[in-house]
Amino acid sequence: MTIIGIDTVAVVVSNRRKALQWFTDVLGLPVAYIGPAEPNSNPSVQGSHENPGHWIELGSGRPMTRIHLCELEGHRVEPGPTGITFLTDNILAEYERLKLKGVRFKNLPKEMEWGEWLCEFLDPDGNEFDLKQPHQP
């Protein structure tokens, strides 16, 4: 038996409806699953963009790593690094696209000494993400 990958990572948000809209409309991530609006409901009955349930999964690709937008009742969102890195094949174009949509960046895309390009951006709750263009030989 071995670990074969990462299935889901969680991002704590202050409002899952607003976060769902931002992650889909601004970042362009596809919805993988929206859970039922009521806790302990039949999991086959999905929620909607207007009335999302506690469990929201975003993501695509093979293998797919999903992002769970998690609104914790009674907990304050603590802004800071998430450790989550989004990949792109053209960081300069993606930086410009996201900037036009109002995304706040901590820095400009920069080529690192090992050949990858990186920059950091924030969601509306102050969660920090990396944007990376892999080294292209």
Where are each of the predicted segments found?
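Short amphipathic alpha-helices within nucleic acid-binding modules
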Residues: 22, 92-97
